[in-house]
Amino acid sequence: ITARTIGSFVLPYFKVCEKNGDAHFFDPSQISDGTLRILGILLALYHTPHPSLMVVEEPEQPVNPALLALLSDACNEASERTQLLITSHSPYLVDLFDPEKIRVVTMQNGETRVAPIRRSQREAVKEHLLSLEQIMSSEGLLPEDA
């Protein structure tokens, strides 16, 4: 990624190199919204100094599902040095993460409650009876009882 100044604006340009050494430059208007979103998230995940907390809302929007595995790998790696809070309604994305690291957020009596996934659901995933994607698509992820 490079930057070019045009008037009073600084615009990012993306350099893509082929195996033969040829380089091509693309401005943001030539790149899909999903690719730009993934690049932005990856830049934030690998930014130094590392922030103590990073929040990403619905990273799956509007991203090609094939790229979500790459994103989850990067998030898992970054979580070793930065606390990550990722919100998602995507069963496919949720399925790419460790059930022990996932929290369910609910509203009860006007209060927000954050809890681990219900033990029975975590055990079903651990025993390979169901995937998180299947659970989320059927009954939904349920919070552990207090």
PLM segments and residue spans:
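Conserved ABC ATPase signature
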Residues: 2-46, 59-66
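C-terminal lobe/lid and adjacent interdomain/linker elements of RecA-like ASCE P-loop ATPase modules
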Residues: 69-146
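Catalytic Walker B motif of ABC-type/P-loop ATPase nucleotide-binding domains
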Residues: 54-58
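Generic structural "secondary-structure junction" signal
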Residues: 33, 47, 95-99
